[in-house]
Amino acid sequence: MTKARTNASASPAVGRNMVINGAMNVAQRSASVTGIGASTILPTCDRWIINLGSTAGRVTVTQTADGPNGISANCLKIDCTTVDTSIAGGEQFILEHKLEGQNVQRIGKGVAGAKQVTISFYVKANAAFNFALEFFDADNSRNCSKLFATTTDWVRQELTFPADVDDGSSPFDDDNAASVRLFFWLHAGSDFTSGTLQSGSFANNTNANRAAGIDSILSSTDNNFFITGVQMEVGP
């Protein structure tokens, strides 16, 4: 069945946040978990998942009352407890958020009038790192990634992803399955870093281009990463 294609310019929802629990205030399942590593998919703060693949490194993940003033009392903290000194090609460490198709229709993906999307968030770390945020279209296996930098102070990042216009791929499914997956890449092997970051536009997925240019949270037991205040809105 061919999905109906409509003009997205009529959407009234510009500016509304599509991320649920971006302030990391709710952690009903896992407020604190230690020794996370190997190949693991683990819920942390509600709607957020730790997704690791084949790494020897280990981390502790906690909901922490250390959010930036005026933004959120809480944040998610990831603390490296065991380093990974020999990185295999297929390794990955991702903080993931899924968005249901019925909640992202306002983007108008793949149709005339498709919208840009801006994702903003607050981050800090123990040092300066480059990590990546990937906007992954799970319905069509298309993606676009952006690098962002950390400092030792809370910094607001604002990353604008281009409209994925009518290119022959389909709109997002209008249902409760995950159509958009936000991947915060914190560590990756060469399978995901050996290409050129797919940053200027959306394209059919090539793994080597998903996380090129990132550092590794697992390079030292001194390393930590904090995030909160995540928002995703239509528009630049």
Sequence positions of predicted segments:
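Extracellular and organelle-lumenal recognition/adhesion modules and their flexible linkers in secreted
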Residues: 2-236
